[in-house]
Amino acid sequence: MESKTSTYLRARFREYYLTASMDAPPGMEAREWGFIFYDTPGMRRHRSFRSRKELVDYIRSTVPAHVYHSAAYYLKPDAPTMKEKIWKGADLIFDLDADHLAEYRGSGIRDFREMLERVKGETMKLLEFLLSDFGFDERMISVAFSGGRGYHIHVRDKSVLKLRSDARREIVDYLTGRGLDPERFIHKIGVDGDAGVERARSLRGPASDAPGWGGRINKAIESMVMHLRELDDEEALRLLKNVKGIGKQKARLFLSQIREENAIKSIRAGNLDFFKHASGIWNLIIPYIMEETVRALGGETDEPVTADVHRLIRFPESLHGGTGLRVTSLSINSLHAFDPLKDAVVFGDDPVHVEIIRPTTLELMGERFDLLEGKTELPEYAAVFLLARGFAEVG
């Protein structure tokens, strides 16, 4: 980045910060703060502030490109080493970023809207886990658009404050469905005969109202069965034979039985043993269903971020130095309607002369820009974005 470009960006950022509200996070005085500047390499960290005013005055006077605070709370947040800081606990945080989604790794800004919509979907999925499976109070959860390629979730419930890294990794494992064992959900139970003597063993799965992954797996089983029932025999048999270990004979048996009137009712009750030889067939199908369920319903998040109890994360209402977009605080209810390419834009539309150094296509504020190398004039909001991203220099 040329010096005239960084000077221009600092001027625009200062303009924003002079009027931005910048509400401090809970316990701000116990958090470590870090800053990255356009004209200085590395991060300036191990800072602490006793009040919101002190923090805001610092940001307005120094105009950083990026502002971070720790998820952790410390006795001495400005101490130079972690040991000296004395850790008191940390929020449970989740970083959902397009880089965690295989189809968007290394993608440019051409796919920005589609990419952000996909990450928003993953964020909403993870929030559902936190609210329904873990039972966190919605008031203890905050969400923020990162200003870049994703979203952050902060859980500030007392129950998570003292969790160490291994416990936080276990939470990520649950959210992502990593290591789910079919035997945990599918098992045989004894069926009593005369005088209490066990006469048989029946295959059981989770019922439709089972909590957590159990309920999700039941609904996935029902969904698969309903789909197979709607297909003609040839197509249904073809799909079943894709499951390892299921040949034509087993596929025909399974298909005929799931088309029986009581099949769906039995599945919803968790009874999978409603036809002869059911056990052997279900034992082949269930792992396949679970794999597909985890792929479709499991959350996506950056495990190292969640597990790191000393992590720094972006300060909501600050600007992202790599886009010029605002790190935007959101309620869970407002997330669905939030459009980061409009709602996180803070700059106006005054014309700015820039030189495009990398051809690109950009969509911001409902406008599409198809840009080739060379000098051009852009509205300020688009110019700031491209300058911050390194696609342009001040003309």
From Swiss-Prot:
Cofactor(s) annotated in UniProt: Mg(2+); Mn(2+)
Domain of life where this protein originates: Archaea
SUPFAM superfamilies in the record: Prim-pol domain (SSF56747)
GO cellular component terms given for this protein: DNA-directed RNA polymerase complex; primosome complex
One BP term from GO: DNA replication, synthesis of primer
One matching Pfam family: DNA_primase_S
This enzyme's EC code(s): 2.7.7.-
Top EC category: transferase
Keyword Kinase: no
Entry keyword annotation includes Amino-acid biosynthesis: no
Enzyme active site: D95, D97, D302
A molecular-function term among this protein's GO annotations: DNA-directed RNA polymerase activity
UniProt KW keywords: DNA replication, DNA-directed RNA polymerase, Magnesium, Manganese, Metal-binding, Nucleotidyltransferase, Primosome, Transcription, Transferase
Family affiliation: Belongs to the eukaryotic-type primase small subunit family.
Function, as annotated: Catalytic subunit of DNA primase, an RNA polymerase that catalyzes the synthesis of short RNA molecules used as primers for DNA polymerase during DNA replication. The small subunit contains the primase catalytic core and has DNA synthesis activity on its own. Binding to the large subunit stabilizes and modulates the activity, increasing the rate of DNA synthesis while decreasing the length of the DNA fragments, and conferring RNA synthesis capability. The DNA polymerase activity may enable DNA primase to also catalyze primer extension after primer synthesis. May also play a role in DNA repair.
Quaternary organization: Heterodimer of a small subunit (PriS) and a large subunit (PriL).
Protein name in the entry: DNA primase small subunit PriS
Species of the source: Methanothrix thermoacetophila (strain DSM 6194 / JCM 14653 / NBRC 101360 / PT)
